[in-house]
Amino acid sequence: MQRKKKGLSILLAGTVALGALAVLPVGEIQAKAAISQQTKVSSLANTVKAATAKQAATDTTAATTNQAIATQLAAKGIDYNKLNKVQQQDTYVDVIVQMSAAPASENGTLRTDYSSTAEIQQETNKVIAAQASVKAAVEQVTQQTAGESYGYVVNGFSTKVRVVDIPKLKQIAGVKTVTLAKVYYPTDAKANSMANVQAVWSNYKYKGEGTVVSVIDTGIDPTHKDMRLSDDKDVKLTKYDVEKFTDTAKHGRYFTSKVPYGFNYADNNDTITDDTVDEQHGMHVAGIIGANGTGDDPTKSVVGVAPEAQLLAMKVFTNSDTSATTGSATLVSAIEDSAKIGADVLNMSLGSDSGNQTLEDPEIAAVQNANESGTAAVISAGNSGTSGSATQGVNKDYYGLQDNEMVGTPGTSRGATTVASAENTDVISQAVTITDGKDLQLGPETIQLSSNDFTGSFDQKKFYVVKDASGDLSKGAAADYTADAKGKIAIVKRGELNFADKQKYAQAAGAAGLIIVNNDGTATPLTSIRLTTTFPTFGLSSKTGQKLVDWVTAHPDDSLGVKIALTLLPNQKYTEDKMSDFTSYGPVSNLSFKPDITAPGGNIWSTQNNNGYTNMSGTSMASPFIAGSQALLKQALNNKNNPFYADYKQLKGTALTDFLKTVEMNTAQPINDINYNNVIVSPRRQGAGLVDVKAAIDALEKNPSTVVAENGYPAVELKDFTSTDKTFKLTFTNRTTHELTYQMDSNTDTNAVYTSATDPNSGVLYDKKIDGAAIKAGSDITVPAGKTAQIEFTLSLPKSFDQQQFVEGFLNFKGSDGSRLNLPYMGFFGDWNDGKIVDSLNGITYSPAGGNYGTVPLLTNKNTGHQYYGGMVTDADGKQTVDDQAIAFSSDKNALYNDISMQYYLLRNISNVQVDILDGQGNKVTTLSSSTNQTKTYYDAHSQKYIYYNAPAWDGTYYDQRDGNIKTADDGSYTYRISGVPEGGDKRQVFDVPFKLDSKAPTVRHVALSAKTENGKTQYYLTAEAKDDLSGLDATKSVKTAINEVTNLDATFTDAGTTADGYTKIETPLSDEQAQALGNGDNSAELYLTDNASNATNQDASVQKPGSTSFDLIVNGGGIPDKISSTTTGYEANTQGGGTYTFSGTYPAAVDGTYTDAQGKKHDLNTTYDAATNSFTASMAVTNADYAAQVDLYADKAHTQLLKHFDTKVRLTAPTFTDLKFNNGSDQTSEATIKVTGTVSSDTKTVNVGDTVAALDAQHHFSVDVPVNYGDNTIKVTATDEDGNTTTEQKTITSSYDPDVLKNAVTFDQGVKFGANEFNATSAKFYDPKTGIATITGKVKHPTTTLQVDGKQISIKNDLTFSFTLDLGTLGQKPFGVVVGDTTQNKTFQEALTFILDAVAPTLSLDSSTDAPVYTNDPNFQITGTATDNAQYLSLAINGSHVASQYADININSGKPGHMAIDQPVKLLEGKNVLTVAVTDSENNTTTKKITVYYEPKKTLAAPTVTPSTTEPAKTVTLTANAAATGETVQYSADGGKTYQDVPAAGVTVTANGTFKFKSTDLYGNESPAVDYVVTNIKADDPAQLQTAKQALTNLIASAKTLSASGKYDDATTTALAAATQKAQTALDQTDASVDSLTGANRDLQTAINQLAAKLPADKKTSLLNQLQSVKAALGTDLGNQTDPSTGKTFTAALDDLVAQAQAGTQTADQLQASLAKVLDAVLAKLAEGIKAATPAEVGNAKDAATGKTWYADIADTLTSGQASADASDKLAHLQALQSLKTKVAAAVEAAKTAGKGDDTTGTSDKGGGQGTPAPAPGDTGKDKGDEGSQPSSGGNIPTKPATTTSTSTDDTTDRNGQHTSGKGALPKTAETTERPAFGFLGVIVVSLMGVLGLKRKQREE
């Protein structure tokens, strides 16, 4: 299905873990925070003793020592000790200035035991007010605004001051002390303290109370001990609220006060717990948002950002093992329900990399809708670093790209807050400590253990350093292990092998465990790696690992203590880069600003199922941090005591969500790059900076003023520009009651203008200042109270600054009240169009050694499906490159390459993408693909694949427009072209790859032998002359040769010159074996040579050995072998206990001979001879025995002339078994293994029992334990002797042993599988499109297996088969929960059956006739019309070319119909043209129509010949006219050429003299020049003639009146005709009328008749008739035969009336369209009425899970929308949608009936799921999934759905932890082709080995 074209799919943005939730504090400020709290929150009013509070405040006082300063600066990421003395003195630090006067708690104004809160506040304010003079003096010294004031338990305030100025502060009158603020490091909340969350809890008591956060993820375990509320009295969502919602929604349920609502949208049941074994992503996310743990042990408790917020468990990922993706329909439903139920914030830690920003994307549209309802959306940015970081997915650019963005969809949503990830300061994770108990102490160091089961597997073991051949630390190759590894912990180095192989080889060597040492030379722990879970393994950093290696090398016999335990450690990554290296770069590909903000996401400790915890990393972890913070902000807005509460209550919809986002971005703290002189980290990486939750809350409580760009976004998007002066405007909003002025920050670092740079040594991206660049305001920034001000700014760049670079930075504004505002800006200086969309062949990304072939042609063999890299050649140094002149394929079915496609490395996201094939003249042959967008290429770390755009293949055929058939294109040069527009640009780029279509094999002649002797050694060569006239000889110079049937399949040829007629002289060296087979005589030579298109020539010849003139006997294959066995070439067994050995050779005469048998008896050879080729064959009988034989060959039948004698040994005695036993003779077993024993004959070399090689003892006895599976097992035992003879015995053993009764317990028939099943009306045999019913059949493994589908128990028959039905309707994505169990075990597992279907084909209405031919003389033909469908996606193909498609990522459950206006040009060929138009929907239902058009070029016809009936005087003259050619029609005009009409068959009767014009016309619209014929021989004023004229005019008047009354002509020309008629009547009525006057009146009236314009022109008539036909087909008989109550006619009759009116032409097109619209409105109403009438209220009022509305509402919405449409084709699309809805509702009604009858053992269901699936009990995972292997702990977005786009050539799939692309890849596989050309001996060998001739990808290290 082409719904989701996303480069790998939506994944959970993090799979790395939550470090302890905690943060850097604010010195003595921990005490100060408590003080601040007392004056603001009533809960402290009478509960804290003043003395106690004072103690808490003053205990933290510290001397201003260097150590204290260093500690404070370290918390800000500054190494104080690395500063010089001047810098140390100039450094600003935080201090507390304490006053001499006593605080309120000590000055006697308060009684601490019972003073009220109001009194405390009042007296505290007095103390603070008295600080004014001292503050002013302090600010004079510090040049900084004083910070927070407090006056209850401490009389003082905070400020920043340079170290050198601290003594000055102490000298100010009224100052008691100046105390350096201390830094505290809480051990349980590192991430929270990074963003000042705890200060919010402490100062404001905001913890999320009264807020709801929706967690759209993999699920939540609501029973976790940390999923709690401290008090559930004032929750936002009560149980009543939830049950009210679920009563309407008809899904989901209430769980706990903490998790009040949840639903599994993926499986359509109430199981909201994620049953993934390794890690539960959604549970981790939920903990970060709102865990509310208790206790002091940070490893056993977590407190989230908003611990008192309620969480919604919106599970959108299935528990099925068959799929780890989700679809748009599922995701959109969860988003919509989040808004409906009243979530304040929704979090989506998921996405598809490198997304766009279009509302056509259903998820982005749903996010906007949620914003409009007031629900804020917070979404992860993604974990792919940059697109230029190759396989690493980090902050690097190896390619020098201008476009490195990777932010994923739906994080690109304009209204969402998109979150980047910063590293946590500390990390809780498994850590290892290694010691010998005295001298050695390594660690603790963070590790990733392969399984928690192995924590004790390394302790007190000996260690073994694995070394390679050079004595260095081995990378783990199997050959490097020795027997010493057994029982020890092996140590190897990272590199070359993937981790799983390293584990496998260590385990195979008998090691007890494995330690892998990193290879980067740093102290960075080796984590985030992919290990199997079955062998004890972990990694160490390079430095720690080397120390261990050194120790073990010196102490090889020591046993070491190894402790592995959860430990809180400093985060090594934080010291290297505060940002997480994986966080995805922005901006959006159209230069919109993203990401928005940064939060802690690297190494986060959070919750898991069953009261568990783990560490994970990713933007998945950063996003919920922001979601929790926005819950706190929302709580602040809802606080009625907030001074701005009244203003906040006015915020609704997007105004509210945009405000939350703006406040957080305006108060964020930009992060500096510690590796590059503390310059800023790019806003494209960090957004507005690290969230500061306290600063945001402070703003909401004190001054919520904001600054945004002119477009309202809290970041300036400069887009692309080329002028060095760029102006932009900012809007400042003052929400206070006093005027505010702002100054730009004077810090030159903060306020500098930056651009991007790349470290040449490491590829790391960083920002650098642009010297000479500046931003200045155009005026002072003054904002009146309660007003806004728009200020213009100018960005100035130096004239020398090069274009094609980013320009970015931060604008920091200091307010007159001490407030600060932060605003990032970003733009591109240059033309955004200019960056290439596609990497070239052998381009910057091309790296075969790294497994990346970049942009490369792919050639496919149709028989095998194997793919090969086109044009790939290897030079002398082994370097592979693509030679674009060698790219070719063949239309010959016998060739290896049968079609061509392209693997594109897209450097950018592109839109309006088209892929064409052009011929050698640049003419378009076909359009292979047309798509709205394609995603750039990137490396997906989880699937370990590059996500390329794999464009469709061309097989060398084309649509022949002349007859409508598909034909093979001519050989020649062609071009494979891709074109598209870079996202954000407006210029189309084109990238061409040349190739050749070549169906003819090369010609080869003059095959011969030559020889060269060097240093006494003779080298023989097979030479030839070869030529290929199109694609050229194989550029790899590969050739296969055979000499006397001795082959060399890996030979290469060299060019030895060119002949005069263009042949290439080639020579190929013979192998040593071939040279030895040469004889003096007729040597048989074969040369197998291909061209670049893979056409093969197999040329054989008889050649003489160079230098030899004699013709001796030659036996092929080097002669008769020394031994003849069953494996010898030429041996063929028979059924009589022996066989035949056949050999061949050459000799100038007939050959005869003899051989001896097993008894030594001599026999004649059976020989044949071909005199034409001097070749012979001979055969001899052999018996199944071992004996010596002699063969003699003679030149005569008398056997007197001996040519050659051979001695050979016949070895055909096969090995034998003695006492062979399987399972001790029993056919049955209940064990996991059986024993196979026996003895073999002494000549046996090996015994294979299944896949096991049995060990043979001295008596040739063997015994092997063979594993067996449940059911029948065929065990084969094969003995092989030294001669290759084999004997095989086999037996079938039936096993009842089944360690996992649920594994593969259920299988389905007819291709149905767990997970997604996509089909259309004709592609699934189990589905009936007429009823919408699917009948699912299958079989279970055990009689004890139980099966539940959609909450209903399925009956299992005695033969273990089952059958049940599901009501699927005709359109949609329907998930059904499945539970499989076993009555013998108390466990089940959950799966899902998801059906994605569309059983309704699109409608297609064309404006041109499809019944009758169309004729034209215009070569440019326009195909116009409309197509509709019941779903939103349509693609259009014309003549086999895919010319248009709509946005493919649709929500198939939306109920929105599809509509496509068709307006496509076609270039006509001369003569007949058959134009085929096909429209296809999302599930490949196709409707096709054909238009036949005849075209001839415009030409001038020969004039007709006019002949009068007489030239003599007469009363009348008849003029006849003949055209010059057949097929032409002659027309005449009597009004001087104003109008023409056909000449009647009898001619034109003329009654008055005058001039008549005649011209010829044809069907194509061609005309001849008009010729005049002047009639002068009419006798004037003859009474008879006058009477004739009167009669003619009378007749014409009558005809005119008939025409006027017909109603077929438009009003204007009908009115003109009436006037002409009246004028003619007046002339007729004149008593003195003359022949001339009457003739003139006749002529004028005829002109008016000729000028009548039809109400319905022919072209519009054809279009309308086609449309009416489509409507009738859509109605069918059932609906068509229903009666319209307003007319009393059936709808079919009404349509027939319209057809008749159209045929008659009595209505205009608009009138007919209006009438059709009325009919369709009536049809829609009738259909809707019928559906509603057939739907009981309990069903009609139930919720449609797909739309979230009731069925009645769905019906009404579709009806209303359809009737509101003005376009008939759109009404038709709504009719289709309503018909689909009818099927769905009917299914729902039937399901309700079934439910009312009780248990339905057939399992019929219509809901696409249900509520009957039980949730697993606490502690039970709900599934026994077996070992799936561990996943990497590096971030990744969970994929939403498999992408089946044209960017991949096979189905896209993903896992929860990462994306995985599709594509066949270019890996050739080994298989025999199904058809073989009629080649000779060598040709047959070569063709059978074609599959191994392609390129192999090197296995890469993970």
Curated annotation (Swiss-Prot):
Q: Output this protein's name.
A: PII-type proteinase
Q: What is its EC number?
A: 3.4.21.96
Please indicate if the UniProt record lists Aminoacyl-tRNA synthetase as a keyword: no
* PANTHER family registered for this protein in UniProt: CEREVISIN-RELATED, PEPTIDASE S8
Instruction: Name a Pfam family for this protein.
Output: Gram_pos_anchor
Family per similarity comment:
Belongs to the peptidase S8 family.
Active-site residues, Swiss-Prot/TrEMBL: D217 (charge relay system), H281 (charge relay system), S620 (charge relay system)
- Point to the regions of Low complexity compositional bias: 1793-1805
Keywords, alphabetical: Cell wall, Hydrolase, Peptidoglycan-anchor, Protease, Repeat, Secreted, Serine protease, Signal, Zymogen
Q: Region (Disordered) spans which residues?
A: 1793-1872
Q: What is its main location?
A: secreted
Q: Which GO terms describe its cellular component?
A: extracellular region; membrane
What does the entry give for GO biological process?
proteolysis
Q: What does this protein do?
A: Protease which breaks down milk proteins during the growth of the bacteria on milk.
Q: Which residues are reported to carry the modification Pentaglycyl murein peptidoglycan amidated threonine?
A: T1870
Spell out the reaction equation it catalyses: Endopeptidase activity with very broad specificity, although some subsite preference have been noted, e.g. large hydrophobic residues in the P1 and P4 positions, and Pro in the P2 position. Best known for its action on caseins, although it has been shown to hydrolyze hemoglobin and oxidized insulin B-chain
